[in-house]
């Protein structure tokens, strides 16, 4: 079973000092109460009180589309194109995060970040809008927020939950069109900040706790005094293995940090696990798809060399590389460590490096408000729990697969992983694990248990190898029955 939670918050501040905005009537209800229109509020709705008009200066305006164009269901071609764009954005984002992080293990939800940025794109104009579209690899089409919203609504019912909320400084004038689209596409019901930091923090953290089913207890520890708008979204994913691991087979084992050291881990095991896996043309990376129910997959990438970095691997990966045709499930002896990962980060520097520095300096967000706004913070937190629980496979499947020849796939060295929604191909989470048990003391390997990479790769000699660790294009070897080796993992 995999339990994942992703949370992201964008905060906006006034561009020049605190905002002094006079509003005769508060258009938002107090923090923590849902917007309603009672019998004494029939004359005008709360949203109408925020209407400042939809006329904007010349130039490219906020994301708009002809009536009905973006309300249609995504076509297979649009879904396919969006999945590839999201994969490219994921690689860009995670490569930069990994370059600057000193943490042994990382996890983030690129979908959560993309949703927040596409939410922002609803109110972005001119160069700000263009940069957002470029970073998200979305081209110039106006329907990105609508496509992401529609696809997220259809993701694995029961396993996937997306919650969003918008917090506003009391009385701050937000354009009605932005509020309406936020509610329609992201379910981000506007709630006003009280101005009392202690109360606001308590209420925000309570919402986060409820949205993540208690897995993120305290997300924010403080708010900038000049914060006028917060966008939060929380992703909750509970993935049950389609073929569960037998807890009685889980045992203490070694995870190889490098050529010299190991750490003890709880290793889940299965003797005949139905697994889709393959090697790339240069056999330094093993890739396996562990299926969840509800059309989700935990995709593991295990480089066979210890000397690798995330940027090297992701630079040569694409959606098509990780989703090859004609790769079928086969009975496999599997070892996979139980995991608990938690990582929180500020993405301001990372997004600036991607080309969005304008958001934090002088963005054009006049589709949100005529008041000058600047993004003051982008906080993200994700959590992953990986355990044995799943849904038992049908007995007929087990019997049929047990008649086939067995291979082995062992995740006992540093690896990357993705969680994909298989129907749409959207990457929900991405992460890397260098040390699944960082609190444990490192153990020195005995000499005979420390084979060199040359020895380790002898079992892969049936596959062509290139001269470089990671070549310019990682391609797949056509899978053939006789080409599946018995992996000789380090012990």
Curated annotation (Swiss-Prot):
It comes from the Eukaryota. InterPro entries: Alpha2AP_serpin_dom (IPR033833), Serpin_CS (IPR023795), Serpin_dom (IPR023796), Serpin_fam (IPR000215), Serpin_sf (IPR036186), Serpin_sf_1 (IPR042178), Serpin_sf_2 (IPR042185). The record marks 404-405 as: Reactive bond for chymotrypsin. Pfam families: Serpin. The record marks 403-404 as: Reactive bond for plasmin. GO terms for cellular component: blood microparticle; cell surface; collagen-containing extracellular matrix; extracellular exosome; extracellular region; extracellular space; fibrinogen complex; platelet alpha granule lumen. Residues 55-76, 437-491 are annotated as: Disordered. Proteolytically cleaved at Pro-39 by both the prolyl endopeptidase FAP form and antiplasmin-cleaving enzyme FAP soluble form to generate mature alpha-2-antiplasmin. It is found in: Secreted. GO terms for molecular function: endopeptidase inhibitor activity; protease binding; protein homodimerization activity; serine-type endopeptidase inhibitor activity. The modification Sulfotyrosine is found at residue 484. The keyword Nucleus does not apply. Glycans are attached at residues 126, 295, 309, 316. SUPFAM superfamilies: Serpins. Expressed by the liver and secreted in plasma. Residues 28-39 form a propeptide. PROSITE patterns: SERPIN. The record marks 39-40 as: Cleavage. Residues 1-27 form the signal peptide. Keywords: Acute phase, Disease variant, Disulfide bond, Glycoprotein, Isopeptide bond, Protease inhibitor, Secreted, Serine protease inhibitor, Signal, Sulfation. Its main location: secreted. Belongs to the serpin family. It is linked to Alpha-2-plasmin inhibitor deficiency: An autosomal recessive disorder resulting in severe hemorrhagic diathesis. This is Alpha-2-antiplasmin. The lineage of its organism: Eukaryota, Metazoa, Chordata, Craniata, Vertebrata. The gene is SERPINF2.
């Amino acid at each position: 079973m995999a339990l994942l939670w992703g949370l992201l918050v964008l905060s906006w501040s006034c561009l020049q000092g605190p905002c002094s905005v006079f509003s005769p009537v508060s258009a938002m209800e107090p923090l923590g109460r849902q917007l309603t229109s009672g019998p004494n509020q029939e004359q005008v709705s709360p949203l109408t009180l925020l209407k400042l008009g939809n006329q904007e200066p010349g130039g490219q305006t906020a994301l708009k589309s002809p009536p009905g164009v973006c309300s249609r269901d995504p076509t297979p071609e649009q879904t396919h194109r969006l999945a590839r764009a999201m994969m490219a954005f994921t690689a860009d984002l995670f490569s930069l995060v990994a370059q600057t992080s000193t943490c042994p293990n990382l996890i983030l939800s690129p979908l959560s970040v993309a949703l927040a940025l596409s939410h922002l794109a609803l109110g972005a104009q001119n160069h700000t809008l263009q940069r957002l579209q470029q970073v998200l690899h979305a081209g110039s089409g106006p329907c990105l927020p609508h496509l992401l919203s529609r696809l997220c609504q259809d993701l694995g019912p029961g396993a996937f939950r997306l919650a969003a909320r918008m917090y506003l400084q009391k009385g701050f004038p937000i354009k009605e069109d932005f509020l309406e689209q936020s509610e329609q596409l992201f379910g981000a019901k506007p709630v006003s900040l009280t101005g009392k930091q202690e109360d606001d923090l308590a209420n925000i953290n309570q919402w986060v706790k409820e949205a993540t089913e208690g897995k993120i207890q305290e997300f924010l520890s403080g708010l900038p005094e000049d914060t006028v708008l917060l966008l939060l979204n929380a992703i909750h994913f509970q993935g049950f293995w389609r073929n569960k691991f037998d807890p009685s087979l889980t045992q203490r084992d070694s995870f190889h940090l490098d050529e010299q050291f190991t750490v003890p881990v709880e290793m889940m095991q299965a003797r005949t696990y139905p697994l889709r896996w393959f090697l790339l043309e240069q056999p330094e990376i093993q890739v396996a798809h562990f299926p969840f129910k509800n059309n989700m997959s935990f995709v593991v990438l295990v480089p066979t060399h210890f000397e690798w970095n995330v940027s090297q691997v992701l630079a040569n990966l694409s959606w098509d590389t990780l989703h090859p045709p004609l790769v079928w499930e086969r009975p496999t002896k599997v070892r996979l460590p139980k995991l608990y990962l938690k990582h929180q980060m500020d993405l301001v520097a990372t997004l600036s490096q991607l080309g969005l520095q304008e958001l934090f300096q002088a963005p054009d967000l006049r589709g949100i408000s005529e008041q000058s706004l600047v993004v003051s913070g982008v906080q993200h937190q994700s959590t992953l729990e990986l355990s044995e629980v799943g849904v038992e496979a049908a007995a007929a499947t087990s019997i049929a697969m047990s008649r086939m020849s067995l291979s082995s796939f062992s995740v006992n060295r540093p690896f990357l992983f993705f969680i994909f929604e298989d129907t749409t191909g959207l990457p929900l989470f991405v992460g890397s694990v260098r040390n699944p048990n960082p609190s444990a003391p490192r153990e020195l390997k005995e000499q005979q248990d420390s084979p060199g990479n040359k020895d380790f790769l002898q079992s892969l000699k049936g596959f062509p190898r290139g001269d470089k660790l990671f070549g310019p294009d990682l391609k797949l070897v056509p899978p053939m029955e006789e080409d599946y080796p018995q992996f000789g993992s380090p012990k």
